[in-house]
A protein has these predicted regions:
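Acidic helix N-cap motif at the loop->helix transition within catalytic regions
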Residues: 13-17, 53-61, 109
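Conserved donor NDP-sugar-binding/catalytic core segment of glycosyltransferases
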Residues: 108-140
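Conserved donor nucleotide-binding strand/loop of the catalytic core
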Residues: 56-90
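Terminal low-complexity segments of carbohydrate-biosynthetic enzymes
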Residues: 210-211, 219-299
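Short beta-strand-to-loop acidic/aromatic patch adjacent to the donor-nucleotide binding site
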Residues: 92-105
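Catalytic donor/gating beta->alpha subdomain of glycosyltransferases that bind UDP-sugars
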Residues: 118, 133-136, 180-242
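A conserved acidic beta->alpha catalytic loop
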Residues: 21, 48-57, 73, 104
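Short, well-formed alpha-helical segments that are part of the catalytic scaffolds
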Residues: 11-26
Length: 299
């Protein structure tokens, strides 16, 4: 019996799309699927944290099938912890468990595919949907950046992988206690698993709506780098994990043979370089406890 935890901060423009995709998948799940009776067994909790909009009301409109919790305290990891505590308190500490960002839309068939992959054996396992970046409403520089980012091997294997989704079985969730108050929650979880225990599910796709403006892209990119610096202090990288080493070379070898990719590669490389500088500046200016939020992709 699966459970889903969705932290949501001012997601009024995306939470309905997120929930509708989950429930449509549940209703349409065929009876001969290995994950039978999905709708009857699915438990969803949405944690609306520090919201100034009607995220909670829109989630409640889906009825009793969605548990909605509200908290005035902001922070994604706090919201996730509150959601998991709520499940335990209600006797619904069920697995596999999907952690899903409130602005992510899973394509049909993705949820059953992830459940089947997460339940393939009793050993610890973490899986994620494959991200599909939607830059259709973004500026040209943002679109060029994501043309390059599509070649980043991080998004094509393992879990988490930048899709705003990851699912663990019970043995996998036992690898850590509560989520620490850090920015890079997904990388924290990733480091709890060996590379052989992490997988991107080929039959699952998550629509990731990217920033619309180049300014927003730079800010979010710096935030991610800032989170990585912070994480290294509390949870060093695994010895058996290559991490981001070699990413530049992989992307360069994939893009440079085709002259049509050159503008995208130049912009992608520039953003990756600048984000290092801006993340250090952000750390000096405001610390690492702020959940920066891209509003441009949510309108």
């Amino acid at each position: 019996m699966p459970s889903i935890v969705i932290p949501a901060y001012n997601e009024a423009n995306g939470i309905e799309r997120c929930l509708r995709a989950l429930l449509v998948d549940a209703v349409d799940n065929p009876v001969d699927n290995p994950v039978d009776n999905l709708m009857d067994n699915l438990v969803i909790v949405v944690v609306a944290n520090a919201c100034k909009d009607d995220t909670a009301a829109r989630a409640r409109a889906f009825g009793n099938g969605v548990i909605v919790i509200e908290t005035e305290q902001g922070g994604k990891t706090n919201a996730v912890n509150l959601g998991e505590r709520t499940l335990r308190a209600r006797g619904l500490d069920l697995y596999p468990r999907l952690f899903l960002d409130g602005d992510i839309e899973l394509l049909p068939g993705s949820l059953p595919a992830m459940l089947a992959a997460a339940q393939a054996g009793e050993s610890p396992r973490i899986v994620a949907a494959r991200p599909r970046f939607d830059a259709s409403r973004s500026s040209l520089p943002v679109r060029l950046f994501y043309q390059g980012e599509a070649f980043n091997p991080y998004h094509r294997s393992g879990a988490p992988n930048g899709s705003g989704t990851f699912m663990v079985n019970a043995a996998g969730r036992a690898r850590w206690d509560e989520f620490p108050a850090i920015l890079a929650d997904d990388s924290f979880v990733e480091r709890r698993f060996a590379p052989s225990e992490r997988a991107t599910v080929a039959g699952a796709t998550a629509i990731v709506r990217v920033p619309r403006t180049f300014t927003a892209l730079r800010r979010i990119s710096a935030r991610k780098r800032l989170g990585a610096y912070e994480l290294d202090k509390v949870a060093p990288p695994r010895a058996d994990d290559r991490g981001s080493a070699g990413t530049f070379g992989v992307v360069a070898r994939a893009m440079l043979p085709n002259p049509l990719h050159w503008p995208a590669f130049v912009l992608w490389a520039a953003v990756k370089s600048v984000e290092r500088f801006e993340s250090r500046a952000a750390a000096r200016k405001q610390g690492t406890d702020r959940w920066q939020h891209d509003t441009t992709s949510r309108t």
